[in-house]
């Protein structure tokens, strides 16, 4: 892998998030091409991407899960300019970084050969993509590093960190809990990686990893802010920001973790239904 091309996923729309199959972006067959119109939102790195895996509606008369197709859409032309008919607008997150975008398609033409799989069978391709995404979204190694850095801060800092832990013994317990939880997160990730190495596609196992890991991100950030005290509010790049402002950024950025790639509620539904065989509500 050369890493020369960046891809993004065109899934969510303003009125189709958790209910993804309600999406309205269309691809109409015109000879050897599809003509695409519609809008996607919360598209990660669309402003950098060379291609998009687009989930769109090719049969408006079919049941909503049955009339969808998976199409590769160029995001840039050969000169690196926006592909004709594609407009990308930034959406800054609360941490102040540009990761998300909204993407508009106006009579975008792509060849029929860009269809992935069979026409009107795109839902199954999208679900498979999400299973793979969720299996890789866990950040166990980074979580361990953050917790270990917080522990080291308490051990080495002269001032706020040690004082807060001595004044609030409950923080000692929180740090211990976070450390144990990062070990659990790592083991969940190992299970998913082992399945992938065996040629299996994780399903509810990926959802379990995503759910636990992303909610753990928020717990680590909350504990970190307690440990760092007022200095924890200092952002990256500021002189006195402890741990280079990582915890402040994590505190803000982790809010999106339990939304992107499927909300925590969606993950629990997947685990309950596909993993435990429980009936739907």
Q: What is each stretch, according to the model?
A:
Residues 27-28:
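A structural signal for short hydrophobic beta-strand segments in well-ordered beta-sheet cores
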């Amino acid at each position: 892998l050369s890493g020369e091309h960046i891809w993004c996923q065109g899934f969510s729309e303003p009125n189709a998030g958790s209910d993804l199959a309600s999406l309205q972006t269309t691809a109409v067959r015109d000879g050897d091409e599809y003509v695409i119109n519609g809008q996607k939102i919360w598209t990660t790195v669309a402003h950098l991407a060379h291609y998009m895996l687009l989930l769109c509606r090719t049969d408006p008369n079919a049941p909503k899960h049955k009339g969808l197709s998976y199409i590769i859409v160029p995001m840039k032309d050969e000169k690196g300019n926006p592909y004709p008919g594609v407009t990308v607008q930034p959406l800054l997150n609360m941490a102040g970084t540009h990761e998300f975008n909204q993407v508009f398609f106006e009579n975008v033409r792509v060849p029929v050969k860009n269809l992935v799989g069979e026409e009107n069978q795109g839902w199954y391709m999208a679900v498979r993509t999400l299973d793979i995404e969720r299996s890789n979204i866990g950040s166990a190694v980074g979580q361990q590093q953050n917790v270990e850095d917080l522990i080291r801060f308490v051990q080495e800092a002269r001032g706020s960190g040690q004082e807060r832990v001595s004044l609030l013994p409950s923080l000692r317990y929180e740090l211990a809990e976070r450390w144990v939880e990062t070990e659990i997160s790592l083991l969940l990730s190992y299970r998913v990686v082992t399945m992938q190495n065996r040629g299996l596609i994780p399903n509810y196992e990926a959802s379990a990893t995503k759910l636990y890991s992303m909610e753990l991100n928020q717990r680590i950030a909350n504990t970190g802010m307690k440990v760092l005290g007022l200095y924890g509010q200092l952002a990256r790049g500021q002189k006195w920001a402890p741990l280079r402002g990582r915890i402040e950024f994590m505190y803000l950025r982790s809010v999106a973790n339990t939304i992107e790639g499927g909300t925590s509620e969606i993950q629990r539904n997947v685990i309950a239904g596909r993993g435990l065989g429980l009936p739907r509500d």
